[in-house]
């Protein structure tokens, strides 16, 4: 008699090219070999995923403003009655599902579902109300020890497991830079500073372009020193084209496509070319629970310049050029109140110039970054196995 296949209800961005969506794609590709998968796809508006067979995908939003499908979650939970319910989202969204989990457990005391929250903690000062809101989960898992510590400081008393993100090194890998640039119509002698991030307040793209403009002006750098931004020119952040024109660097700007959106990006193969076109990756993010584009860039051998805060120093293990931040907090908006950190402008300019003027330093850091990201701990298959071991042990 064949063993009964357990059911998993997976709740997260799927199948979309967001950061959460990348994580979902990689985890689901392994989970589906072991579970009967039911997926509530956030930012998904079809009836099923046409690319990955054997999955039952429900759009999260019912068109009623509930974009995370919290109400639909409760309905599908009662319908599917999974063995494992895996939720990938921020802790304050996890709290919303947590209320439904509590209700489900009260109504169904005989249910054996294990509820798991895999959550990014990208900053200090996690509100106690958020921590209390995730108490109905049976397992809480963070990406880093930084995240684990912040939840504990917020008052979480239960056990917290730590499982990192991964990177698909069969896709994100070094290529010949000159050939890539020829294919992308980028000058082979250009010096490219790359930023891949969503155009949203936490990423501080206003500072990215300002610091770049200060750097090229202070050092009177030639026109072939350019900044490459991959992301939406207009989203929930700034009007990028107006800002770069104000700064006078519009002629130095490279973009992937003027019509990109948060849910419509490039293929992974095209993204690998984007990373390989760069001389250095630079982000001004004010808080980070992981930073998938950073990991992807590093796996192609591109050195990274990063602000020295939150989870970044931990998982990169020093394999980056770190820039100090200002010694004052900047609280996140929408009442979240997590502490964001602002990168030091003068120190960032110095770091950009150091990497520009030192080709050997770039090569060495790029080599070390590649070695770090190709370690087994960042392999998605190994990461999925770690999760399933946690599910098994209860």
Question: Each PLM stretch: what is its role?
Answer:
Residues 343, 347, 357-389:
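A charged, aromatic-enriched C-terminal amphipathic alpha-helix characteristic of glycosyltransferases
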Residues 286:
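Aromatic "clamp/platform" in nucleotide-sugar-dependent glycosyltransferases that forms part
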Residues 294, 303-306, 321-324:
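Short hydrophobic beta-strand element within catalytic cores of glycosyltransferases
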Residues 237-273:
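Nucleotide-activated donor-binding/catalytic signature segment of Leloir-type glycosyltransferases, i.e.
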Residues 9, 187-203, 209-212, 227-228:
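Conserved donor-binding/catalytic core segment of Leloir-type glycosyltransferases
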Residues 173-186:
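A short helix/loop element that forms part of the nucleotide-sugar donor recognition site in Leloir-type
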Residues 146, 166:
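Carbohydrate-associated surface elements
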